[in-house]
Amino acid sequence: GIVKENPTFVLLLGMCPTLGTTSSAINGMGMGLATMFVLICSNVVISLIKKLVPDMVRIPIFVVVIASFVTLLQMIMQAYVPALYATLGLFIPLIVVNCILLGRAEAFAAKNTPLASFFDGLGMGLGFTIALTILGGVREFLGTGKLFNIALMPENYGMLIFVLAPGAFIALGYLIAIVNKLKKA
């Protein structure tokens, strides 16, 4: 999940938070870590209850498990990192419908042990976090001349388009192209 099956650069999953929250490296890292928390926790729980869940209601049960951890995450973030919680806003509850989580629950956690599911969640979560942090860092640097909110270039440096929505598409496209080029080499 970190490199070969990176959810962002290879599988192209989770594009809504990828494009919407990566205006800075800190935001990308925050969203990635939040998603990783939910992914690990939901993978382990789904792996533990897989034999108790009838096939007919499997997907709704998985969504309830994921939503429960997202709700817990929201409360924790609101209490301990309110600035990041406010910045990420609507994208936190949207973790529930992130196809990475439901995909890993269905494809991996429902068929494997809790320990294997933990490591699957960790790997996919790290891959997602790394990708969002890199994309956020590229956009922040090109858009403002900063990285992790530390000025690296003069104040008048920056291309505004990279902190706006079109910049997300442009930067993501180039990063995917670089990953594809490196895979072929």
List PLM regions with ranges:
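C-terminal transmembrane helix-loop-helix hairpin of multi-pass membrane proteins
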Residues: 116-185
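C-terminal ends of transmembrane helices
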Residues: 42-55, 102-112, 178-182
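Transmembrane alpha-helix boundary signature
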Residues: 72-87
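Cytoplasmic-side transmembrane-helix entry/capping segments in multi-pass membrane proteins
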Residues: 53-66, 87-93, 117-120
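Structural signature of hydrophobic alpha-helical transmembrane segments
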Residues: 25-41, 61, 85-96, 166
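A glycine-rich, hydrophobic loop/mini-helix early in the fold
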Residues: 35, 39-76
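Hydrophobic core segments of alpha-helical transmembrane domains in multi-pass membrane transport
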Residues: 14-19, 35-36, 40, 67-74, ...
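N-terminal membrane topogenic signal
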Residues: 1-8
